[in-house]
Structure formats: structure tokens, C-alpha cells
């Protein structure tokens, strides 16, 4: 792991609880992680919170003035062009100027993606960005990354092939899986199952020697621990993401309601408290912080709009892990080495407008 203090630009005005919860998460990050944070947003509101929550680590917090924020009701591409000094734009600009190493935002996800494409650009050889989310599995020592979970409503086989390549790199170097197993989300295990997208993608993944493709993954397989990377289109992935999060929330609520019933239940709950905390750490989305935007030439973590301090802390941790493990550089190196093959597979040019028009820009509630 790198000993260099990573520099993270945080969109302090993005999210339902900005800026207080965003700043609180950043304070914890500079206290516990080897990071330096640029808080981009309204300097008066940010500084007010910092003054009320003094910490020796605050020397590693810097306030960057921004003007405005992209609201959830705004069309992302129009808004980021109309608001050049919005917090998400200036956050991306810090990375572009190499004053920061990564961006974390709990604001408008479509705006974050559009700003990343405009300011940072795509990695050469990658046609579409993808949002990758990490899920727990039945194996406590193993996680699975699913992508795309919301960057693109529609997709093409070659996009999913690229997602598989990027996911494999992340799984290997960040999640620590020496031999990642890649699965294609589908309605059956057999290669003949699925729609046209699934069938053609299966052919590409099977024939690419750089992808350790295990086969189709059914919905029940995603969290089984059998796969380390699962690829799908953003429409399907976003539904999977929100369903999985709701199941985790329901399970935690049921445990809270059922365990304390009666004296025996209260005693049992007291004994099980450490176990319950570990369960929460594994299934609560706040513990994961956010999702990496793959395919852009910079580290960008997209967090929930409902993120509070713990989520922001974990999002900054995710950003630092991506920086320390050189995820972007490794993807760039791979695409450069295999550029001829990638260009041969590319039949059309993807424009920013095409990406923005297909992006899923709703806020995760």
C-alpha cells in the first residue's frame, strides 16, 4: 500500500444531508486514513461545521469555494455546462489539474458521470463507462463486484466485455482475488439461455483469453461466492442493486424487532450484539460507501444520495484503495496493450451525448 497521502476531492454539496454529513465523513477520513481532502462547496456552511467540530486532523482538510450544485430535477449534461462552477464540476477539475487524485460525490449521479466524461475523458479503448458496486457474499472473506449497476440503460455485447475486463482488474488488485471468476448475469446457466444481448456477450466472453469467464450467473448465484465479477446491462444491474439493498435493510430491521422480545430474547440479543454488528458491516450499503465509475480517466466514487457520514468515510476509503492499487493505470495499460483488438471490435464511435442520454440519472433513495 502506498505511504503517500492520497488527495481526495469531495463534492460537499452533493446529497440529501450535505454539507454537514459530508464534512463529518471527511473529518473521520483524515483522522483514520492517510488522506488529504478538498471539500468543494459553500465555504460559509462548510467552515461553520469545521469550526464546530475542531480536530487536529483538520489541517488536512481544505475548503474550495464553489457556486451552486446540480439539482436532482436538472438534466445532467445541460446543468454541468450551464453551471461551470458547480461543486461537482470543480471537484472533477481538481483531478484534471492533478491537484487531487480522486472525486467522491453523493450528488446527482448522472451529473457526476457527465462531468467525469467532460473533465477527465474516457480511457482509450473503453466505449462506455460503467458503475461497479461491491456486494458481500456467503464467504466472509470474499466480495463480488457487479457492473454495470446504473451508468447505461441499454448496452451492447462489446460494452459488457469491456466491463468484464475492468471488473477483473479491480477484483484482482483491490479485492485481492488472485484468480477472479467472471459471470454473465442471465436467466439460466446454459450458454443457450437468455436474450440476444446475453447470447452474443456469452460468445465474446468465452472467446476472450484475457477474461477468466466461468459462465452464466443466475440471480441466486450473485452472492453465492462462486463469482468474483458479474456483468450485466445498467438497467438490470440497477434493479439488482436496489433489491439487494432493500433485502439487507429488511433483514436488519427484522433482527432488531424480533431478537429483544421477552427476557430470554433480551439476554440473547445482548450476547449476540457483537455478531449483529458484524452482520450489519457485511450487508449494510452504508458500510460499502459507494461505487466506482469505471472507464473514465480518473478515480470517481459515486455514493448514495442518502449518504451520511459513515458512507462518505467509506467512499473516501474506496477512493484511496483504487488510488493505492493503481486501478485506472492498470486499465489504461491493458487497453493500450490490446488496442488493436479493441479497435477491431469497435464498430461505432460513442459520443458524450449518447452516454448522457442513456445514463440512469435517478438518485438512489
Curated annotation (Swiss-Prot):
One of its GO terms (cellular component) is cytoplasm. One of its GO terms (biological process) is fatty acid biosynthetic process. It catalyses: a fatty acyl-[ACP] + phosphate = an acyl phosphate + holo-[ACP]. Keywords: Cytoplasm, Lipid biosynthesis, Lipid metabolism, Phospholipid biosynthesis, Phospholipid metabolism, Transferase. The keyword Cytoplasm applies. InterPro entries: FA_synthesis (IPR003664), Phospholipid_synth_PlsX-like (IPR012281). Belongs to the PlsX family. Catalyzes the reversible formation of acyl-phosphate (acyl-PO(4)) from acyl-[acyl-carrier-protein] (acyl-ACP). This enzyme utilizes acyl-ACP as fatty acyl donor, but not acyl-CoA. Homodimer. Probably interacts with PlsY. HAMAP family: PlsX. This is Phosphate acyltransferase. It comes from Picosynechococcus sp. (strain ATCC 27264 / PCC 7002 / PR-6). The lineage of its organism: Bacteria, Bacillati, Cyanobacteriota, Cyanophyceae, Oscillatoriophycideae.
